[in-house]
Amino acid sequence: MRILYCASEANPFCGSGGLADVAGSLPHTLCRKGQDCRIVVPLYGTIPQELKNSMNFITNFTVPVAWRHQYCGLFWARWNDCTYYFIDNEYYFKRGTLYGHYDDAERFAFFSRAILEMLPYIDFHPDIIHCNDWQTALVPVYYYLFYSHRPWYYNIKSLFTIHNIQYQGEYCLLYTSPSPRDS
């Protein structure tokens, strides 16, 4: 089975709690069991330089965010027999902390959309996209609205796991509205 595991944090690259522990271990267990499980996380500025040195550039593209398109760099690395992908945008992710910013809704709306945009660039058609917590909750929504009708994206299923119900990512609807180009 081909699984894309989407999380806002994953050990050893970036973490602030239990999600990082799960995202850093569950995909590796699935890989050891013979599944093609790949992980995607933001390329935060807080990732240690020695881990950044192991990353390889794939490409860059733009991601629709509300009324504009934002730069997205895409990197990959192997760690413990799993492939990691890193979504790069310094405006959104080169900060001193993972969360707690005024624009977290926009940052993770961008991340969710970038996950879907990156798939053809890595030539990976997952059977399942496993989303974790509010930071990736828009992936299934964006898939249904903007990608499910495109032949390359047919038949991708999604799974959503809540790790901590206390953090719900409640923000203004403005950040989830489609751009005029998407309507």
Where is each model-derived feature located?
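N-terminal subdomain of nucleotide-sugar transferases
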Residues: M1-L74
